[in-house]
A protein has these predicted regions:
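Small-residue (primarily alanine) positions within well-ordered alpha-helices
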Residues: 16-19, 23-24, 28
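Glycine-rich FAD pyrophosphate-binding loop
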Residues: 12-14, 28-48
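Beta1/beta-strand and adjacent pyrophosphate-binding region of the FAD-binding site
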Residues: 2-19, 35
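Accessory recognition modules or surfaces
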Residues: 4-8, 44, 50
Length: 126
């Protein structure tokens, strides 16, 4: 969004990545006027590891307690993931499972893999 010279905003969020989009979503939920700006047009690609662990959902659930199941319903954008496997050049591997702090949090997969373009766009439009 581009603000004209006549528009005044008390809150301006610079950057519509995950942090900026989440801040905007929380402000919108509370009915607090603000402006979210970014130098890029969305959706846009961003280099990233693309993994969303359970720690991400600790924050996302504060916005929407059902967000894990909503993301899980979009399987073409958010692939379920139960952990990570690191493989060394010599072929040795290390499995790192995603774990939940409580069994109540396991209403879906422990995490997701999603291209950053799709994750950012999802949050930006939330």
């Amino acid at each position: 969004m581009i603000a004209s010279n006549s528009e005044k905003h008390t809150i301006v969020i610079s950057g519509a990545g995950p942090a900026g989009s989440m801040a905007s979503a929380f402000l919108s939920r509370e009915g607090i006027p603000h402006l979210l700006i970014d130098k890029a047009l969305f959706p846009r690609d961003k280099i990233c590891g693309d993994a969303l662990s359970g720690k991400v959902f600790t924050v996302l659930k504060k916005l929407d307690p059902d967000i894990r199941s909503k993301m899980g319903a979009l399987e073409s954008d958010f692939l379920p993931c139960e952990g990570i496997v690191f493989v060394a050049p010599n072929g040795k591997s290390l499995d790192v499972p995603f774990k939940s702090k409580s069994s109540n949090e396991m209403a879906g997969p422990a995490g997701f893999v999603s291209p950053r373009m799709k994750f950012d766009h999802y949050l930006h439009n939330y």
